[in-house]
Design a protein with these regions (language model features):
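Soluble catalytic domains of enzymes that build or remodel membrane lipids, polysaccharides, and related
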Residues: 1-124
């Protein structure tokens, strides 16, 4: 199952719960959520999806990632900025994107092109 959610500012948690409730989880199917705004990840009930893929933050746009340090201007904020995150049994991958938002600047946080290989553990 592939479910997509656009950006929702207010009422994010209620919106996601209603959206996921509209589509019954199919037994023996992987359930992926394409979530524009990674901040909504914390509002997803544990086990509601197998993987959340997100973007929105552009990886923080400014940071020290290019120097080998996992730090961006968003590191201490509530926003998951880039990479893999876990909350209970839920997993989130935030893509850094290739461009920028707002001010035309990207320093120390390179864009990325990702290739993901999903392997389903059939024992679960």
């Amino acid at each position: 199952q592939l479910i997509g959610a656009d950006y929702v500012g207010r009422g994010r948690g209620e919106h996601l719960k209603a959206l996921l409730g509209r589509f019954a989880r199919r037994e023996d199917h992987v359930r992926l959520l394409m979530l524009h705004d990674p901040l909504g990840f914390r509002d997803i009930e544990s086990g509601a999806v197998d993987l959340v893929l997100s973007g929105h933050t552009h990886g923080g746009q400014v940071g020290l990632v290019s120097l080998g340090f996992d730090w961006t201007v968003l590191t201490r904020s509530p926003w998951p900025d880039h990479g893999l995150f876990a909350l209970g049994s839920n997993r989130l991958y935030v893509h850094r994107g290739t461009g920028f938002y707002g001010f035309p600047l990207r320093v120390g946080v390179p864009g990325e092109a990702s290739l993901m290989e999903l392997i389903v553990n059939e024992e679960d």
